[in-house]
UniProtKB/Swiss-Prot annotation:
SUPFAM superfamilies: Recombination protein RecR
CDD domains: TOPRIM_recR (cd01025)
GO MF annotations in UniProt: DNA binding; zinc ion binding
Protein's gene: recR
Keywords: DNA damage, DNA recombination, DNA repair, Metal-binding, Zinc, Zinc-finger
Protein name: Recombination protein RecR
Toprim domain: residues covered: 80-175
Length: 198
């Protein structure tokens, strides 16, 4: 279908977002057109402000509006434990638990040879530099439980083996309240593998 140019540009802009296909982009574009002008201006301003005012923490790589970020700057955090995650959204997920009291290192990606992403393309060199600080005693690898995340965790684990730093991997398994019959084989395998004595 042919749309007026301003609508086409809006649709194209929405389609650049992850998970937004043509149908959803059209729906969003027309939703925006039906919004009050003040709401549209507020939405546009929020987008511009987020892009302008946010950056990556120079210590951990988490998204922040100050440097260092509030987590790295928190004196109550255990600086001896570094949890390595793939993306800033993973930090947010971990923080929602309100249990982890260490600090983070955000890789901003994962090793993926199929996509041409190697260790030097994500924040692994920054991690190694950061770990030269003698206070770090444990690195928790909390990358995603997929091929890229596992490859990244294994790569980092091998790099850190000679350092004497304790390297652990988060367990993957069954969700609380989940039924065994609905779990896939990989999840069941990881749950069994990550079992602990009670």
């Amino acid at each position: 279908m042919h749309y007026p140019e301003p609508i086409s540009k809006l649709i194209d802009s929405f389609m650049k977002l992850p998970g937004i296909g043509p149908k959803t982009a059209v729906r969003l574009a027309f939703f925006v057109l039906d919004m009050k002008e003040d709401d549209v201006l507020g939405f546009a301003k929020a987008l511009v402000n987020a892009k302008r005012d946010l950056a990556y923490c120079s210590v951990c790589g988490h998204i922040t509006d100050r440097d260092p970020c509030y987590i790295c700057d928190d004196s109550h955090r255990d600086q001896s434990v570094v949890c390595v995650v793939q993306e800033p959204k993973d930090v947010i997920a971990m923080e929602k638990m309100k249990e982890y009291q260490g600090v983070y290192h955000v890789l901003r990606g994962a090793i993926s040879p199929m996509e041409g992403i190697g260790p030097e393309d994500i924040n692994i060199p920054q991690l190694l530099k950061r770990l030269q600080d003698e206070t770090v005693q444990e690195v928790i690898l909390a990358t995603n439980p997929n091929i890229e995340g596992e490859a990244t965790a294994m790569y980092i684990s091998r790099l850190l083996k000679p350092t004497g730093i304790k390297v652990t991997r988060i367990a993957h398994g069954l969700p609380v309240g989940g039924d065994l019959e609905y779990a896939d084989e990989v999840t069941l395998s990881k749950a069994l593998e990550g079992r602990r004595e009670i």
